[in-house]
Amino acid sequence: HASNVTGNRNDLRRIGKICRETGTLLIVDASQTAGIFPISMKEDNIDVVCFTGHKSLMGPQGTGGLCVRKGVEIRPLLSGGSGILTFEKEHPSAMPVRLEAGTLNTHGIAGLLAGVRYLMEEERWKNFQKKELRLAELFYRELKDCPKFIFYGDPAGGLRVPVISLNLREEDSGE
C-alpha cells in the first residue's frame, strides 16, 4: 500500500477497480499504513490484506495478521500441531485454524489488540496520521533546499506516508 523507502502511497481504490475488472487477485501489504490510513477491503476490492502489528498499530514485535476475503483459497505454509486436532493426520481445513500451525503468540495477540483498541478510542488514529504527516512535511520543508541532500520518492506528493528517505550527496550510503 505504501513504500517504506520512498513514502509514496498507492491509490488502492483505483488499483482495486482495475484488478476486479480484470479478475486479478489483489493482495495488499499494509505494513506501512495499517493504523494510519483507513483500508476497506470491500470498497477497495481487496482480496487479501497483510500487516505487521509493531508499527502504527502499536502492537508488540512479532505480531501481524492476514485478512482474507471469503472465497479466496490459501494454502497453509506449515502444518501440524494445530492444538485442536493434535492426533489427526490431516491439518484442519476450516479457517483460520487452517493457517495456524503450532502455538499461537497469545501474549503478542493480546498486546496487538490493546494497541488497536487504543487507536480506535476517540479515533486517535486520525490524530496520529495528521501529526506524523505534519512532522514529515516539516522535516522535508526545512531540508529540501539544502544542496547536501538527495531525496527519494516524492516528499511533496499527494499520496504519502510519513517517511522521508534521503542521502548525503558526498557520502557513501553504506557508511
Residue ranges, per PLM feature:
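Pyridoxal 5′-phosphate
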Residues: 1-175
